[in-house]
Curated annotation (Swiss-Prot):
Residues 1-32, 167-211, 356-404 are annotated as: Disordered. GO terms for molecular function: histone H2AK127 ubiquitin ligase activity; histone H2AK129 ubiquitin ligase activity; kinase binding; protein heterodimerization activity; protein homodimerization activity; RNA binding; ubiquitin-modified histone reader activity; ubiquitin-protein transferase activity. ANK repeats lie at residues 427-459, 460-492, 493-525, 526-546. The keyword Cell inner membrane does not apply. Residues 389-404 have a biased composition (Low complexity). Processed during apoptosis. The homodimer is more susceptible to proteolytic cleavage than the BARD1/BRCA1 heterodimer. The gene is BARD1. The modification Phosphoserine is found at residues 186, 391. Signal peptide: none annotated. Residues 560-653, 667-777 form the BRCT domain. This is BRCA1-associated RING domain protein 1. It catalyses: S-ubiquitinyl-[E2 ubiquitin-conjugating enzyme]-L-cysteine + [acceptor protein]-L-lysine = [E2 ubiquitin-conjugating enzyme]-L-cysteine + N(6)-ubiquitinyl-[acceptor protein]-L-lysine. It comes from Homo sapiens. Changing residue 564 to H: In an ovarian clear cell adenocarcinoma. Residues 197-209 have a biased composition (Basic residues).
Amino acid sequence: MPDNRQPRNRQPRIRSGNEPRSAPAMEPDGRGAWAHSRAALDRLEKLLRCSRCTNILREPVCLGGCEHIFCSNCVSDCIGTGCPVCYTPAWIQDLKINRQLDSMIQLCSKLRNLLHDNELSDLKEDKPRKSLFNDAGNKKNSIKMWFSPRSKKVRYVVSKASVQTQPAIKKDASAQQDSYEFVSPSPPADVSERAKKASARSGKKQKKKTLAEINQKWNLEAEKEDGEFDSKEESKQKLVSFCSQPSVISSPQINGEIDLLASGSLTESECFGSLTEVSLPLAEQIESPDTKSRNEVVTPEKVCKNYLTSKKSLPLENNGKRGHHNRLSSPISKRCRTSILSTSGDFVKQTVPSENIPLPECSSPPSCKRKVGGTSGRKNSNMSDEFISLSPGTPPSTLSSSSYRRVMSSPSAMKLLPNMAVKRNHRGETLLHIASIKGDIPSVEYLLQNGSDPNVKDHAGWTPLHEACNHGHLKVVELLLQHKALVNTTGYQNDSPLHDAAKNGHVDIVKLLLSYGASRNAVNIFGLRPVDYTDDESMKSLLLLPEKNESSSASHCSVMNTGQRRDGPLVLIGSGLSSEQQKMLSELAVILKAKKYTEFDSTVTHVVVPGDAVQSTLKCMLGILNGCWILKFEWVKACLRRKVCEQEEKYEIPEGPRRSRLNREQLLPKLFDGCYFYLWGTFKHHPKDNLIKLVTAGGGQILSRKPKPDSDVTQTINTVAYHARPDSDQRFCTQYIIYEDLCNYHPERVRQGKVWKAPSSWFIDCVMSFELLPLDS
């Protein structure tokens, strides 16, 4: 092989045609140290450019039909149509954000800061992200919104505006034929007056006004003579559209507030003007009109009608959900995470009541919403503009603004906050989930202070604490733990927050979790502890320390206030009670405004037994497996004496029922999680149907075929039973053959690897004590 390391003053020899072309030498980008590295970084950044705007990619997305990669803002007008470069058709659900490429761009930004000693990079990682539709400066009309005060309906339409900017407006007379400016010198109070006049003639067809009349009404000539507006004056934008490219003009605004609840119907221009620069990327009712519909003027009545009939929603962008099956090694890509759609823009207060618009964006505090449509729409028909809804594009900096505090101090706004805070996207994520993923500390703090549940789980089982530990947001983890987040709760595949922190090497978070009582010996579905996922010696030294006071840690994790436990309705049921005791229980249900069932249901919260010991009835066992309160009948008497709901702890049956309740409050897996049962033979003492109900209620699964102990497929299953003792071989046994032991026939003993035979009495004892008891010979 030829030596390519030649001095610069020596001419390279002629390359043979059979030899491969050598790589070009890196030319230094400048003088000084790291010149070759800077040159290589420049070449890398040339490859990381958008295929449309040729700038460095920001939130890179792929339309799915081709290999071109764009900035998310550059293709907001191409969603659902096709690639703007090769014109390949692309479905809207194929839109994907390349999180790995985005991480590479952030690393390039850090490297450039190191090489150039520049702290102000345009790729700075901490710069707030922009969503797919929030570029209000470059694409002011990307989203149109219509609102009807009568029907209380809102519709959003995505405009397919051209990427090319329009030419500047000429001041000569000939330019007036192409573009027009309509400036209103009147204060915003006139808008409400015009809206009232418009409502009186909403049923009549409005006459078309000539251009001269409109110019005269809007006082265009006078404004041009007076000159430009004062740049210091706050202004809002009004949009008057005569064609597919509407003109945007400005008019004064008072206190930066926008009121849309003027009585009567609003004209198209007023609706547009009051709702500019409001970005709602996650709205369910988003349509992309075709070319024909863009050239026609749509009235609010027509829009509201279409809104009622149209139920097609825009699929939510893959906003950082971990994959349920493919778990990679990197902390972000292991859960198939992609960036979150975020909103930005100026702080706008609007009074648009919309129920079908989820707001799973947490880069900003949530907005208070009113429910509309159906009964709630009729009840709120007389609502005034004091019901304020914050824009989802509110940046965290507005948390301390006076206008924000004024809005959130209103009782109506705070009353509607919980309904909005529990909104979920199609992955089951709440606002708190996404704020924890993004590390948005102001939004997390705001949501927690206003009653958001820190222990809510998404469809995969992840809590906000899991997400914060996975992404390494130490401050978010601290906030969640301070607001009673459960430190040992399990997520997908029974991973605890400590598992996530250990996998990704977040030592500070591991220390914080351990200080709050995180269990070092917690195992996931594969039987692996947090220490099994790390190679770092310092982290191993933390995770290998013995748990000195495990009982206190468990009690620390199980602390939940009474109000949090009693959020839901009380559902009472009695087991083994006499007729007189049943009457007293019915009286208590009336006093406490609770429900009383005769058959067990998954909604039951309290099971009342006559004595001090729990009975092996089906109701009691189902109550134990579901984590219900198993109470003595003295609790009913105490509640009847004081006419209030007494504290349950003093009247709770100890041992198994208490362990079951604490297990449920800590959101831990059920008793038979990871176990499979085959019911062999006939059952007389406990019918087979009852055993099936118990297995299902305990999180186990029923096998339709008898497992074979000598089967390689059976023995190679790598899952474990969560509640089995970690120091016994029973933890690896996941398949049980249950038989009736009260009869004279006893089958041969099987205890081979994953398959064990066990009597039905052992199964019942496990339920009553809520633990997997040792299986004696």
